[in-house]
Structures are given as structure tokens and as C-alpha cells.
């Protein structure tokens, strides 16, 4: 049984249907990813509501999944470390990452990435389009960069221009993990997406994002 679960969790998608426990995990993952994908952050009421909804889905998922005593102990230990990290840093990120790992039993990794890619793509492009259409606030920062004096950096709906560019990096990570391309297709896709990287850079002027994408 343990061997079967291990193989399944490494990305097997032999099962054609979605079990309830799997659906609740995807809901948990999608809610948190969408919240971050549209630029929500800690301290915002909407982000807190997303955390509550996601945690509810996580609890339901855990209740629907059979666990051995040892697995439950491991989950509790991991969650305890997540809580300690939150208490010491004030950031929810570590605790959320722990939940993502702790709830993975009976959930194929590749399906998780497919759900994540779909959610992040919708969140990323909808945020940018709404910002360009002036439907949501667009933060502008004036910095002295590039030896050109003061320039304007735009966030395109995100909390900070750096967050905009990092969000694009995450989009690329999803794409290249899931894409099954031959050498020629990979070169073309890389060139096009790197062109998108420079387009985002024109707004963000984020060296961090530019370097991450290049690496």
C-alpha cells in the first residue's frame, strides 16, 4: 500500500476520476495560489478570508484521507514547525508550504501542477489586463536606476514591481515543468517567453526578476 501511494504521488495519473479528497486538496491549493497570484498579501481582509477557506478545504481533505498513526504524527510535527516559523517570523508562507506538503497523500503531483498552472495563468493575466485597463490600482514607484536618473516602475496590479516580475518567473516555472517539447520547440518557446520577460521588465525594472528568469 505504501509503495502504491508513493508511486501515485510521484505524478501518476492512471485514475481517470477525481476522488473527493483530491478535489478538496485542489481547492485548498487553488485558493491559496489564486490569492497570491492576484497580489493579495498578509494583513488584507480578503487574504485572511482566503486562508480560512483554504484551511477548511485542507481539513476536509485530511479527514477524507486514510492515514496511519505514524503519518498523522509526521503531519503534526510538520505543522508544529510551520506554526513556530509563523510565530517567529510573522509570515504565513512557511506554514502554508507545510500544509501543501502534508496534504499530498493520494494526490498526483502532475495534476497539482496542472491545477496550479491554470490558476496562476488566469490570476496573472487577469491582474495585468485589469491594471492596464485601469480597473484596479497600479502602484508606481520612482527610483533612480540604470544611470538614467529617476524612472517610474509599475507594478501592474501587484503590491510591488518586484512581485510582478517574480509572478512571471513562477508562470514560466509552471510552463516548463509541464511542457513536453522537443529541442526546436523548446528553443522557440524559450525565445518567446524571454521576450515576455523583457516586456515585463519594461514595467517592473526588476533586476531580481530579470536575473531569475535568465538563470
Positions of the model-derived regions?
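Hydrophobic transmembrane helix bundles of membrane-integrated enzymes that assemble
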Residues: 11-36, 47-66, 70-215
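Flexible, glycine-rich phosphate/dinucleotide-binding loops
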Residues: 40
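Short, intrinsically disordered terminal tails adjacent to the first/last structured region
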Residues: 1-14
Amino acid at each position: 500500500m505504501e509503495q502504491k501511494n508513493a508511486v501515485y504521488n510521484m505524478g501518476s495519473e492512471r485514475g481517470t476520476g477525481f476522488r473527493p479528497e483530491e478535489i478538496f486538496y485542489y481547492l485548498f491549493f487553488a485558493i491559496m495560489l489564486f490569492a497570491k497570484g492576484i497580489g493579495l498579501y498578509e494583513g488584507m481582509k480578503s487574504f485572511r478570508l482566503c486562508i480560512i477557506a483554504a484551511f477548511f478545504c485542507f481539513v476536509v481533505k485530511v479527514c477524507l484521507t486514510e492515514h496511519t498513526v505514524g503519518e498523522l504524527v509526521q503531519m503534526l510535527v510538520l505543522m508544529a514547525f510551520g506554526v513556530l516559523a509563523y510565530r517567529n517570523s510573522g509570515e504565513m508562507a512557511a506554514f502554508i508550504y507545510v500544509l501543501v506538503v502534508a496534504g499530498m497523500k493520494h494526490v498526483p503531483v502532475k495534476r497539482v501542477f496542472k491545477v496550479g498552472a491554470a490558476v496562476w495563468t488566469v490570476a496573472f493575466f487577469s491582474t495585468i489586463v485589469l491594471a492596464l485597463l485601469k480597473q484596479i490600482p497600479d502602484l508606481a514607484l520612482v527610483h533612480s536606476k540604470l544611470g538614467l536618473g529617476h524612472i517610474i516602475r509599475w507594478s501592474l496590479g501587484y503590491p510591488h514591481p518586484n512581485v510582478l516580475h517574480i509572478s512571471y518567473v513562477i508562470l514560466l516555472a509552471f510552463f516548463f515543468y509541464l511542457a513536453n517539447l522537443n529541442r526546436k520547440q523548446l528553443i522557440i518557446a524559450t525565445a518567446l517567453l524571454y521576450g515576455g520577460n523583457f516586456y515585463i521588465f519594461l514595467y517592473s525594472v526588476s533586476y531580481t526578476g530579470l536575473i531569475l528568469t535568465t538563470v
